Amino acid sequence: MLQRPEYGEGHPERVCCYCGGYADTVDHVPSKVFLDEPYPDNLPVVPCCRKCNEEFSLDEEYVAVLLECVRLQTFDPYQFKREKVIKIVKHTPAILSTVRESVLQLLDGHYTIDSENARLKRVLTKLIAGHLRFEGLDQLFLHSGLKIDFYQDIHTNDELFRRFYSPINSDLLPEVGSRALIALVKNGYARSQWFTVLPGRYEYCVALDNSEVRIIIQDFFGVIGHKVDFRNG
């Protein structure tokens, strides 16, 4: 990835991106467990406390295995494609049983993920928070009205696929000095930009008014995190 410095002052570097406590380390966004080696240069990082960093680790490994099982429709580690997932299962064999118990099986035999899976939602919320912080945007709606839509095999639904890549226009400008505003100035238009962290593995897009975050994982799973408009129910 291209290096994207930030010049704003609205987000102190010593405040944890996730809990608001003292940040004594940094966290990669996305977590490396969702990427494959060799990693690209200039991976995005955000300030984080060690407690949050460690607490998210097990859930992230679980989600990485969950996504691999459902994407490939198998629980056989010998059929897994991602080396990182294979290593997780070798190190923690019991994780496969945990994943299998949490996966839903459809009438046609296909496996699918429960979108209300608590561990999945926790990790997705973390990713959304990290992307908002990295772009220098407000995270307040995460605590007051976040809705997460989770989709599988997005390429099979043309309408959904177009929705993901449709531009998110905004009438509001991001904070001065933020990465989001710098990208806007370079592009010359007030719409969000897609950033590819690793081709075929992870890309994301953040609305300039911080109202929405879109993520595509493994070129298969789609995530939309957005504000809930309580006025419309």
Indicate where each model-derived feature is located.
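Histidine-centered nuclease catalytic patch
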Residues: 15-45, 56, 61-62
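Zinc-coordinating Cys/His ligand positions in small cysteine/histidine-rich zinc-finger domains
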Residues: 49
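Polybasic, low-complexity binding patches
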Residues: 54-90
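C-terminal, charged low-complexity interaction regions
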Residues: 114-233
